[in-house]
Amino acid sequence: MHSRSALLYRFLRPASRCFSSSSAVTPVTVTQSPKSLEALRARLANESPSLTDFIHGDTYSVEVGTKKKPLPKPKWMKESIPGGERYVQIKKKLRDLKLHTVCEEAKCPNLGECWSGGETGTATATIMILGDTCTRGCRFCNVKTSRTPPPPDPNEPNNVAEAIASWGVDYVVITSVDRDDLPDQGSGHFAETVQRLKFLKPEMLIEALVPDFRGDGGCVEKVSKSGLDVLAHNIETVEELQSFVRDHRANFKQSLDVLRMAKEYAPAGTLTKTSVMLGCGETPDQVVKTMEKVRAAGVDVMTFGQYMRPSKRHMPVAEYVTPDAFERYRLLGMEMGFRYVASGPMVRSSYKAGEYYIKSMIEADRVASPSTSP
């Protein structure tokens, strides 16, 4: 492993070309020939600007406005307005089935793209189970909170599984609110939903974006062995900002432990994944250090996206990180050994284009190692 200062010097420097947010989901694998990796290193080594120039210049981030001095969002943060026939259809279907989506609850900027089908032509949504009310209150999240949310619907696992199975999609993301009020943190409900969906549609690939279950190994094991294909748990921000960004019951070590346990308990071939928001006040060095620890925990996939303030009640955006800087983190992740890195201002943990690449990666793994097939 290279020293952190060397990694920063090599990767966090302005490139000679500009990157759009669409470049964030360019498929990346770390299985390269030595020759191609040497070519990458040579290209990076030939770029002369220093780390100091990168961090303090306009290449890394742009200023965020204040109430007295408002500034428009940078051009790469412009969102598409939700609409179109498919968007209307999927919204109606979700309402009819009384299903919650994190897309709406968290005010995801990609809602219009994913629900309308985007470039792939297939509409997707991330389903949220265990209700729409969380027991925690993270400073970045728009989901409703309560110490005593309504009890989970016992029929939800079956209803959700039947609804998703009827959509005709082949990759789905299921997530949930935190349920600290339940004895098993909601892990049994989560596992039952995955198991029921796999029973109805065995060929469907399922990504479970889970809470930390308060670090309970039994809960992590239960979900990890439920039949999912990808277990995701988000660390959300760098280690140094955990207490500022997340609820006091969440912390960096606990989240890393969840990811480690998931890799230990899940069947061979199951991928683990995590996500980090940038623009919360972190430094490049803190990001690199966090990436190193995440990779050491055996995580396969990592995503980076720009934090966007959902309302004035939430923590403000510290800075808008440029597409160029996001691309640097993607390259660094590739060099560190992550199997896939999605990094761009509009990338979110459950990002449509990233899901399609992970799907193809899983299918390729199963062709190479038939024993890992379900």
From Swiss-Prot:
Pathway: Protein modification; protein lipoylation via endogenous pathway; protein N(6)-(lipoyl)lysine from octanoyl-[acyl-carrier-protein]: step 2/2
Transit peptide extent on chain: 1-19
Residues that hold [4Fe-4S] cluster 1 according to the record: 103, 108, 114, 350
Predominant location category: mitochondrion
Alphabetical UniProt keywords: 4Fe-4S, Iron, Iron-sulfur, Metal-binding, Mitochondrion, S-adenosyl-L-methionine, Transferase, Transit peptide
Highest taxon, organism lineage: Eukaryota
Keyword presence, S-adenosyl-L-methionine: yes
InterPro entries noted in UniProt: Aldolase_TIM, Elp3/MiaA/NifB-like_rSAM, LIAS_N, Lipoyl_synth, Lipoyl_synth_mt, rSAM
CDD domains assigned: Radical_SAM
PROSITE patterns xrefs: RADICAL_SAM (PS51918)
Location within or outside the cell: Mitochondrion
Binding residue positions for [4Fe-4S] cluster 2: 134, 138, 141
Family: Belongs to the radical SAM superfamily. Lipoyl synthase family.
Record's protein name: Lipoyl synthase, mitochondrial
Source organism of this protein record: Arabidopsis thaliana (Mouse-ear cress)
Gene: LIP1
